[in-house]
Amino acid sequence: MSKLNIIFAGTPDFAAQHLQALLDSEHNVIAVYTQPDKPAGRGKKLQASPVKQLAEQHNIPVYQPKSLRKEDAQAELKALNADVMVVVAYGLILPEAVLNAPKYGCLNVHGSLLPRWRGAAPIQRSIWAGDQETGVTIMQMDIGLDTGDMLHKVTTPIAADETSASLYAKLAELAPPALLEVLNGLESQAFKAEKQDEALSNYAEKLSKEEAKLDWNLTACQLERNIRAFNPWPISFLTLEVDGVEQSVKVYQANVLPHQAKAAGTVLQADKNGIQIATQEGVLNITQLQPSGKKPMSVQDFLNGRADWFAVGKQL
């Protein structure tokens, strides 16, 4: 195995963990591409991405083009003469000229077992859909959206209480060693490229705040999966009327109970064991929630002083 000159492209913390693995390896990271600094926090000060922060700590040149479609940006990248470009949650589309610039093209670390979930939110959608397992795919990028040939996959089970936050953490542990395996075998072609089966592909649509609102016309099983999939963002929530004012309550944890006899959205019970609400099929038993302006709390703490919010028989 010879040392590779690598361009790394990524933006969030998930990507920074891969960059750290490359920095700790035998390979040479010659440049980093990341999204432009964005306003963040109350003061809306420009904030560098986790990837940029890490690159600067190691004195690696950082490039932050708004787009890679312009010829000058493409020429700048090509002039780096990289052996390979590694892309992890970068957030910009790579035109064909960029894909072809490095000697071995561009590799992508994708957070699902392709072709199962292509697109923006594969980790969240695997929980949302009730998948039993997921993993990461290291693939050779082409001009399609996550359609390139697969080089290596690593799988992990999805636990019954898995949230997107915990699954991100799992995949952030699994993926960097898998990426290094592929990079170490790149010159010898140790990993054979496998075409994706188009018939098995699904598009992992971005999550939205609108989708996070609990819809009692869905099944309790689906709602419970949504609560886990939408944690840490955008967090599932319900709305209800209290003294003529609409209140929004975020929901962090719930479980499913089989019985049901009332119309969807009816409060069946509210005590220290949970707030039971009828759904289209089954009962959603909410055990951790957060009223506006407060921290997440147990159902027991919530009901202290708010028992009337979920009166038995109330229709949400």
Curated annotation (Swiss-Prot):
GO terms for MF: methionyl-tRNA formyltransferase activity
Binding-site positions, (6S)-5,6,7,8-tetrahydrofolate: S112, L113, L114, P115
Catalytic activity, as annotated: L-methionyl-tRNA(fMet) + (6R)-10-formyltetrahydrofolate = N-formyl-L-methionyl-tRNA(fMet) + (6S)-5,6,7,8-tetrahydrofolate + H(+)
Organism of origin: Actinobacillus pleuropneumoniae serotype 3 (strain JL03)
Function, as annotated: Attaches a formyl group to the free amino group of methionyl-tRNA(fMet). The formyl group appears to play a dual role in the initiator identity of N-formylmethionyl-tRNA by promoting its recognition by IF2 and preventing the misappropriation of this tRNA by the elongation apparatus.
Enzyme class label: transferase
Gene: fmt
Source domain of life: Bacteria
Keywords of this entry: Protein biosynthesis, Transferase
Gene3D superfamilies documented for this protein: Formyl transferase, C-terminal domain (3.10.25.10), Formyl transferase, N-terminal domain (3.40.50.170)
Protein name, as recorded: Methionyl-tRNA formyltransferase
PANTHER family: METHIONYL-TRNA FORMYLTRANSFERASE, METHIONYL-TRNA FORMYLTRANSFERASE, MITOCHONDRIAL
Family indicated by similarity: Belongs to the Fmt family.
Enzyme Commission no: 2.1.2.9
InterPro entries in UniProt: Fmt, Formyl_trans_C, Formyl_trans_C_sf, Formyl_transf_N, Formyl_transf_N_sf, Formyl_transferase-like_C_sf, GART_AS, Met-tRNA-FMT_C
GO cellular component, one term: cytosol
